[in-house]
Each structure stands twice: as C-alpha cells, then as structure tokens.
C-alpha cells in the first residue's frame, strides 16, 4: 500500500500574491469549491490578519468547504494567530499555518532577533495556535538558506510544542533538486522527533525548478507538497499542483506515494483560476496547456493512432480533456443542457442560476452553430462573473461604428444605480472608443494595466474571452467578459472590473513570503 502524499493548495493565499491576481470573497469560494471537487487535502484560504476582507474570505471558505481542511496563515504574533483561529472556527477541519524566518540574513536584517529568540517565538506560536486547533503547521521561512544545525534545532522544538506538519520553504527559489532532496534526508534523519510530524515542501519557481525540487523532496521523505493551480504565484510562481500530481501518478514505478486527487477535475480547476485571475495558461504548459496532448509530427501522429502509449504517457481524459468536442446546438433542450453540465462537473447552487445559464446558452446557440464544451465553460464563467454583489454598473446596450478613414465610434448605455445613462466617444479603435464612452459615464480615475483577448474555440464565430486589469490608488482588480462579439466581451470585462474596483470589500494586503 502506497503512502498518501498530502496536497496542500495555496492558490488562494500564495497564488493571490501574484501581482494582479487579487480575488474577491465570492471568487475565492468558487475556487475553493472546485478544489474540494479535486479532492485537495488542505486549502490555504488566506492570511486572516492581513485585512478584514481576507479574514472574511477565509471565514467564507471555512463555511463553504466540507471535505477539505481549511487553513489560515499567521505570523508568529498574537493578533495573527487569534485572527486565524477565529477565521477557521466554522470549518469541519481547520488548520493554522504559522511561520517565522530562520535564515541568518532574515533573523539579523528583518526580525532583528537572535537565534535563541527565534526558537522561543516559534515554540510560543505553535503552542498558541494549538489553543484553537490540534492541526498546526510550522514553517521556518527561508529554510533553504538556513544553517542546518539551527534548522534542526528550531524544527525539533516546534514538533515538541505540538506542530503536526513541518513545512520547508525554498522561499526565494534558490535550491536545486539534489540539494533540496538532501536537505529533507538530513532533517528526517537528524531530528529525533521527526516521525511525530509530516514534512512538507513549499517551492518557488525562480529558477524553473519548483516542481523538480518538490519531487526531490518527496523522494527523500516529504509527505506533503504545497502548490498552486497553474503554478500561480508571485515572481515566477509556485509549484504547479497539476504537474506534481500527474508526475507522481504517472511514475508509480519511481515514487512510493500517491495522492487522493480526482484528476479529471484538474482542467476545470485550471480554467477557473485562469479566468478569475486573468493569468492565461500558455499553450505548451504541461498537463493543462492546449497543446499538452497535441501531436504535429506525422511520425508521432501515426504512432499515437496505432497505439496511444507510443507517444503519450497519460490519457488526456484523465485530467479533464474531453474527447467529445461538439455537444449541443440551438435545438437542445434544458434537460440536455443540464446533463452536459453534469458531465463537465459544473454545478449550480440554485435553479435560478441554472435558468440564467440556460438563457445565455440559448442566446449563444442562436449566434453560434456549434457549441463546444469550452463554450459552455466560458459561458458559465461569464455568468458567474456578472453575478457581483452590490452591482453598480451593468451593460444595457452597445453600438459601435468603424469606416476606413474615419475615427471609430462607440455609443454605450449603462445601468448605473437603477438609472440608464448613455454616452458616445471616438477612439483609436472600437474597443478604445467603447472604454472611453464608459469612462464618460463613470469617471473611474483608474488606469488600464492589461487588456487581453483569447478565443475559446476555433472559427470566426468563436466565443472570445477578454480580461482587463485595472489599478487605482494601489488597488488592482481583474475583470472578465465573454461573447461572440469581442467588443461586447471587452465592455463586459471593463464593467466587471469597475464593479470590483468600487467594492469596498476588496482589500489590499501585505505580502507573506513563505
């Protein structure tokens, strides 16, 4: 019987620290529910002491998730630990993850504490966290650059104090696989009480080695890996959940562990996170990129047709790629739509949400002859995106015009706090004109940081997905929109971002570098 490798997902905490990836409370809950479908063991939902918004997000995830452990991050200080404990109180299974830096440069320059003081603080933090839960994780921040003897000392003390998981972070992505694997080997063999805790790896991808380092740690005895969907994270990102899971699953001849992850939900999780954060997945990304299971070479194509395993080491269906491309059309009824949603793993909390999605589907089917799985997923994402709490702005109508030699124009009507208002503008293109017309009505004062468009499927009638990123006074939000008309999709995305920008529930939080 293989040992279980615990999958600890930190998309909602460390992943959100990627500049521009900030999420609303509702978006975090949606992602958490998908992670629960994926059967992730632990969901790190946020940093409760960072802000009231983050506290409420962790609390909301703790209430919504039933089958995964919900974790809150806390520095080794009283307020952080208390806030984390309060935030996870409603969880069926809760964990507090507390940390303090242990590398010489961090202790001297950042903490201004002696090694003895750091050990004392670590012990206190673990004991204080256990006042709220028996499930306590301790991280020696920047462990990869810490002195081995001191690292052993502080970890032994933390386990004695009651830590049940010891996480070893390569905070700045400095380690290489052989070195990181050897570190785990040393820790597990030198620390007398190492068998009393699960050892975990948390790697950053600054040198492109996050997954390799994590797998090296697993080979040396780590039994938890901290990761994010799509490898999302600050700087170059974190360990990609989908890559670790499928590496372990595919190479059962090499690894002595397996995970409980329900892999057919991987692609849905990837698309949801990409859609909400606005961080598109590159086509050649392992497991979830659109080219991950494509074969251009004639020799490869011939081999795959004769026997799949000649050039494919895993099945596309095992991670959620559908072999059934064309699914529905304009004559499809509600029951067929509901059935296909179920096959795609898409669920709605209320019949009204299903009805709204079906109406959107019928509208799309009138404009698009063939409806694909990707269209349905984009349509549902678009509907969820527009379901914003305290919605202030809503698109009512949009008319654009362009002619060679003349400036493109746009006339837009918005519903603003219960009243319809209309404005027109010219621009360098129809999208530019549309955004300028919107600004005539709302005067947001925000700066457009990113505008990107991607097609959901092939063909000129494909749904287009648009992402905009806006910044105002240090706050960054993402907006998404989807439509067969790319200008309409752009307007939807811009309006979605504006609604988030004026939502006072959104927050700006300090970075936690674990």
Curated annotation (Swiss-Prot):
Places the protein is found: Cytoplasm
Keyword Cell membrane attributed: no
SMART domains: LeuA_dimer
SUPFAM superfamilies to which the protein is assigned, alphabetical: 2-isopropylmalate synthase LeuA, allosteric (dimerisation) domain (SSF110921), Aldolase (SSF51569)
Assembly, per entry: Homodimer.
The keyword Manganese is assigned to this record: yes
InterPro entries listed in its UniProt record: 2-IPM_HCS-like, 2-isopropylmalate_synth_dimer, AIPM/Hcit_synth_CS, Aldolase_TIM, LeuA/HCS_post-cat, LeuA_allosteric_dom_sf, LeuA_bact_synth, PYR_CT
GO CC, alphabetical: cytosol
GO molecular function: 2-isopropylmalate synthase activity; acetyl-CoA C-acetyltransferase activity; manganese ion binding
GO biological process: L-leucine biosynthetic process
E.C. code: 2.3.3.13
Encoding gene per record: leuA
Keywords per UniProt: Amino-acid biosynthesis, Branched-chain amino acid biosynthesis, Cytoplasm, Leucine biosynthesis, Manganese, Metal-binding, Transferase
HAMAP family: LeuA_type1
Residues binding Mn(2+): 14, 202, 204, 238
CC cofactor: Mn(2+)
Protein name: 2-isopropylmalate synthase
Entry-linked PROSITE patterns: AIPM_HOMOCIT_SYNTH_1, AIPM_HOMOCIT_SYNTH_2, PYR_CT
Function, in words: Catalyzes the condensation of the acetyl group of acetyl-CoA with 3-methyl-2-oxobutanoate (2-ketoisovalerate) to form 3-carboxy-3-hydroxy-4-methylpentanoate (2-isopropylmalate).
CDD domains, alphabetized: DRE_TIM_IPMS
NCBIfam families to which the protein is assigned, alphabetical: leuA_bact (TIGR00973), PRK00915.1-3 (NF002086), PRK00915.1-4 (NF002087)
Pathway named in the protein's UniProt entry: Amino-acid biosynthesis; L-leucine biosynthesis; L-leucine from 3-methyl-2-oxobutanoate: step 1/4
């Amino acid at each position: 019987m293989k040992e279980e490798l615990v999958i600890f997902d930190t998309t909602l905490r460390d992943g959100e620290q990627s500049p521009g990836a900030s999420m609303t409370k509702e978006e975090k809950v949606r992602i958490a529910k998908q992670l629960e479908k994926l059967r992730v063991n632990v969901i790190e939902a946020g940093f409760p002491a960072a802000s009231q918004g983050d506290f409420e997000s962790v609390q909301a995830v703790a209430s919504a998730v039933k089958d995964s452990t919900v974790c809150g991050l806390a520095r080794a200080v009283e307020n952080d630990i208390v806030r984390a404990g309060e935030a996870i109180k409603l969880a069926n299974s809760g964990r507090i993850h507390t940390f303090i830096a242990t590398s010489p440069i961090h202790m001297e320059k950042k903490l201004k504490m002696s090694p003895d003081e750091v050990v004392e603080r670590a012990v206190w933090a673990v004991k204080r966290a256990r006042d709220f839960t028996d499930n306590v994780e301790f991280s020696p921040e920047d462990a990869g650059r810490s002195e081995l003897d001191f690292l052993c000392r502080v970890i032994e003390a933390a386990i004695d104090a009651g830590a049940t998981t010891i996480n070893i972070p390569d905070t700045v992505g400095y380690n290489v696989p052989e070195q990181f694997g050897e570190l785990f080997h040393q820790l597990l063999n030198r620390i007398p009480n190492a068998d009393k805790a699960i050892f975990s790896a948390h790697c950053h991808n600054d040198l492109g080695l996050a997954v390799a380092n994590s797998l090296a740690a697993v080979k040396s005895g780590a039994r938890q890996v901290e990761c994010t969907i799509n490898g999302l994270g600050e700087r170059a990102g974190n360990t990609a959940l989908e890559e670790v899971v499928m590496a372990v699953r595919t190479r059962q001849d090499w690894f002595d562990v397996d995970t409980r992850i329900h892999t057919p939900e991987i692609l849905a999780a990837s698309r949801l996170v990409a859609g909400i954060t606005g961080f598109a997945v590159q086509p050649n990304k392992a497991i979830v990129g659109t080219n991950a299971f494509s074969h251009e070479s004639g020799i490869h194509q011939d081999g795959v047709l004769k026997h799949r395993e000649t050039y494919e080491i895993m099945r596309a269906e095992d991670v959620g790629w559908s072999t059934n491309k064309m699914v529905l059309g304009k004559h499809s009824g509600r029951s067929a739509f509901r059935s296909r949603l179920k096959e795609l793993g898409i669920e709605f909390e209320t019949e009204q949400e299903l009805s709204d999605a079906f109406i959107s589907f019928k509208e799309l089917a009138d404009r698009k002859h063939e409806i694909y799985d990707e269209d349905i997923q984009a349509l549902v994402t678009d509907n969820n995106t527009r379901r914003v709490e305290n919605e202030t702005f809503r698109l009512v109508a949009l008319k654009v015009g362009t002619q060679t030699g003349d400036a493109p124009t746009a006339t837009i009507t918005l519903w603003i706090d219960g009243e319809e208002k209309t404005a027109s503008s010219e621009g360098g293109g129809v999208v530019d004109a549309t955004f300028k017309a919107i600004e005539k009505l709302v005067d947001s004062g925000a700066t457009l940081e990113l505008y990107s468009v991607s097609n959901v499927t092939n063909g000129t009638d494909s749904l287009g997905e648009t992402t905009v990123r806006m910044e105002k006074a240090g706050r960054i939000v993402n907006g998404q929109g989807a439509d067969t008309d790319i200008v309409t999709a752009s307007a939807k995305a811009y309006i979605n971002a504006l609604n988030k920008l004026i939502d006072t529930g959104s927050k700006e939080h300090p970075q936690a570098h674990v």
